[in-house]
Amino acid sequence: MSFLHLSFYSAFTLSSLGLAFHRTHLISALLCLESMMLSLYLALSIWPVQAQTPSFTLVPILMLAFSACEAGTGLAMLVASTRTHGSDHLHNLNLLQC
């Protein structure tokens, strides 16, 4: 395993651990999700170059588009939950209380 692969795996693992352990605020969960998507995007961008397959070059761009949609939806949920509940704490977002 090369240093490049190890750095992508460690970035994805650290961001997923951050998502698992820092679950108090919605903004921290969104930042961890975005770092997971960024590390996945970088790994998918390098993979077709190393494998020398030009047919997979569209996959990172498609994943980046879905990541932008996810970020926009997450920020809209953050604004809506902050307006209705007064904070971005995840324990306030219980569906049984609404």
UniProtKB/Swiss-Prot annotation:
Its EC number is 7.1.1.2. GO terms for molecular function: NADH dehydrogenase (ubiquinone) activity. Its main location: mitochondrion. Coiled coil: none annotated. Keywords: Electron transport, Membrane, Mitochondrion, NAD, Respiratory chain, Translocase, Transmembrane, Transmembrane helix, Transport, Ubiquinone. Gene3D superfamilies: 1.10.287.3510. It is an enzyme of class 7 (translocase). Pfam families: Oxidored_q2 (PF00420). It is found in: Mitochondrion membrane. It is a multi-pass membrane protein. The keyword Membrane applies. One of its GO terms (cellular component) is mitochondrial membrane. The chain crosses the membrane at residues 1-21, 26-46, 59-79. GO terms for biological process: ATP synthesis coupled electron transport. It catalyses: a ubiquinone + NADH + 5 H(+)(in) = a ubiquinol + NAD(+) + 4 H(+)(out). Core subunit of the mitochondrial membrane respiratory chain NADH dehydrogenase (Complex I) which catalyzes electron transfer from NADH through the respiratory chain, using ubiquinone as an electron acceptor. Part of the enzyme membrane arm which is embedded in the lipid bilayer and involved in proton translocation. Belongs to the complex I subunit 4L family. This is NADH-ubiquinone oxidoreductase chain 4L.
